[in-house]
A protein has these predicted regions:
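Bacterial N-terminal signal peptides
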Residues: 9-19
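Histidine-centered catalytic/metal-binding microenvironments
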Residues: 463-595
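Accessory, solvent-exposed terminal regions and/or long lumenal/extracellular loops of proteins
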Residues: 276-359, 369-371, 480
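A contiguous strand-loop segment
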Residues: 25-123, 143-313
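Substrate-recognition/cap regions that form aromatic- and gly/pro-loop-enriched pockets
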Residues: 340-483
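Second-shell loop/turn segments in exported
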Residues: 115-117, 125-134
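Bacterial N-terminal signal peptides that target proteins for export
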Residues: 1-9
Length: 595
């Protein structure tokens, strides 16, 4: 593979930095036909240096006529406006609601001139308001469109994952600019397109627009703004025939920075889930299978004439655990693997601190941006299941901080109480809380960063044990017991429920069900939090000062022959060969042992 010309690097990196140093996130979408158990799955890493990891919770509510909802910018907390409330809002838990609708996002910026300077609904508010108002993915798309067009869109170009228990969509949108006449923005609203992910396929996006050409007469699978093409023509972004129009080329054109820093993460997710072979349908509808390496020059930003397919078909059915593990990727085993150069230090650290670029020897260079990253606020796998009642079907697998050293725990979306470790207000970025998940996960991740190749595998073993037990055994047992309770209620109230199934049936008859899953959710989250507090103490004792103290099978520490307060022989793992060779080369004359 060739290296990009230095001039290209210099110019493109200036575009890379603003996009990646704000909110840079990653989503993977798994349709129910592509998942191992028939679930719809959506992952989300909410990555930001300014986001505290906590679980947003809003119970269902009925609202009187004239009620208003205050809208605040999700990123900054700035007050934007107030809007009319609807008669009934669904319960929301994080980025899911009680009807098993999931909405997540990644921001790609796009053309600066399309910002609506008078917009009053930001992208975060669109997500959480739509979750309160929509019972299906298609309804959510319409809610988002209606809100943005009525109140004006206050954010940059955005990609949403929008899914429910039956289907999944990728939606992209951006404003139309600011043109004030008589105090009114004549360009208020959004241009947008939404495409249904074919059942059996998967999709991913990571801060770069993904939708290219799209079908103009297939409303079952593609929805779009009537003026999505005409606005591009008016702005001079496009002048070809309608059927050749590409949303991403018009509104979010790629450059080195957006590809290397963003689409490379999509490539990596596809590479993992496809087993290294991308199977997809091309623009002519032909089945194609190509080696993932065929797309690597594009993913690394070397050949911007390339592209990635929007959808691919995985090598095998994808489990919740498998897609959660994708969120822990650091480009291992690829040319972008950060452990393979001296930037990884002496312990193969797969992270690079910000900023995203640096200057050396007259050139500008980048720090890689992998899926797993240090500045994650919270991350999740949303699981929606059409074969289980809504009171049991939705599970938000939720975690905080860096996905590579943190776990996700099951949060049923019908809960009536949030675990204290995830509770809003339990700490923030400037105030430490010993009872907050975000802070204990940061203590563990930051401990691992100092001796990563030695400590992180120890943590990963605990993560895998917990998640495997929950995903493959324990939640199945909870589901079964909860469904028994649900069926008992249905048998008693069948006539009443059947007559109101499509209306707003009170959830009170299912209180036993929701109490059961709430108890399990809270107990599991708090017990695992306590286990992580103990793990952080164990890491300190075990790996203090670069030593590795041996442990027994039960986790206790081995002690010396003479006293229980002194460890048995400690190990000194030292540094990687790469580090030793580099230090010897750079400082050998000073450090070399003389014979």
């Amino acid at each position: 593979m060739h290296k990009p010309h230095l001039t290209l690097l210099l110019s493109a990196l200036f575009l890379l930095i603003p996009a990646l140093e704000g909110n840079s996130c990653t989503n993977v979408i798994i349709t129910k036909g592509a998942s191992k158990d028939g679930s719809t799955l959506v992952t989300y890493a909410a990555d930001s240096h300014y986001l505290f990891g906590e679980l947003y919770y809003h119970p269902a509510a009925d609202w009187k006529p004239g009620s208003l909802l205050k809208v605040y910018d999700w990123d900054s907390g700035k007050y934007l406006t107030e809007i009319d409330q609807v008669p009934h809002t669904w319960q929301t838990v994080g980025n899911m609601n009680e009807k098993q609708v999931i909405i997540t996002e990644t921001t790609w910026g796009g053309r600066e001139e399309l910002m609506d300077r008078r917009g009053r609904i930001d992208y975060g508010s669109l997500i959480y308001i739509a979750l309160q108002r929509a019972s299906t993915a298609r309804e959510a798309i319409q809610v988002i469109v209606d809100l943005a067009n009525e109140y004006g869109y206050a954010s940059e170009g955005e990609t949403f994952s929008i899914a429910d228990k039956n289907e999944a969509w990728i939606m992209e949108l951006i404003g139309k600019g600011t043109n004030i006449r008589n105090g009114v923005n004549m360009e208020k609203g959004i241009v947008w397109v939404a495409m249904r992910v074919p059942d059996g396929a998967i999709c991913a996006h990571a801060n770069q627009a993904r939708i290219g050409a799209f079908p103009l007469n297939d409303p079952d699978n593609c929805l779009y703004a009537k003026d999505v093409i005409s606005v591009a023509r008016k702005r001079g972004y496009f002048d070809g025939p309608d059927e050749e129009f590409s949303f991403k080329k018009a509104y979010g054109p790629a450059d080195f920075g957006t590809v290397r820093g963003c689409d490379a993460r999509v490539w990596s997710a596809f590479n993992i889930l496809s087993g290294g072979w991308f199977s997809y349908y091309d623009a002519q509808g032909r089945a194609v299978t190509k080696d993932a390496s065929d797309f690597l020059d594009y993913a690394m930003g070397y050949n911007l004439d390339g592209d990635l397919p929007l959808f691919i078909y995985p090598r095998q059915k994808v489990s919740v655990k498998a897609v959660a593990d994708v969120m822990r990727d650091h480009y291992e085993g690829t040319p972008m693997d950060m452990t393979q150069d001296i930037g990884a230090g002496g312990n193969a650290l797969p992270y690079r601190w910000r900023p995203m670029e640096y200057q050396a020897e007259g050139g500008t260079y980048l720090n890689e941006r992998a899926i797993a990253t240090q500045q994650t606020g919270f991350w999740m796998v949303g699981q929606a299941r059409d074969y289980v009642p809504d009171e049991v079907g939705g599970i938000l697998w939720f975690g905080t901080d860096d996905a590579a050293t943190s776990y996700v725990t099951p949060i049923y979306t019908s809960i009536t109480e949030v675990p204290d470790c995830f509770r809003q207000g339990n700490g923030d970025l400037l105030h430490y809380s010993p009872t907050a998940s975000f802070w204990i996960n940061n203590r563990i991740s930051n401990a691992c960063y100092k001796m990563y190749n030695i400590m992180a595998p120890h943590v990963r073993k605990r993560i895998d044990a917990f998640e495997t037990e929950q995903m493959e055994r324990k939640t199945h047992a909870v589901d079964s017991a909860a469904i028994v309770l649900y069926n008992q209620v249905v048998d008693k109230l069948r006539e009443k429920i059947e007559s109101k199934r499509d209306a707003m049936v009170s959830r009170k008859p299912f209180a036993k069900v929701t109490r059961y899953v709430t108890d399990y959710t809270v107990r599991t989250a708090q017990e695992q939090f306590a286990a992580w507090v103990s793990l952080e103490e164990e890491l300190l004792v075990k790996f203090m000062d670069g030593n590795v103290k041996p442990q027994n099978e039960d986790g206790t520490f081995k002690h010396s022959e003479y006293t229980e307060g002194q460890p048995a022989k400690v190990e000194w793992p030292g540094y990687t060969d790469l580090w030793k060779e580099t230090v010897a080369r750079e400082a050998g004359e000073v450090l070399k042992v003389k014979e």
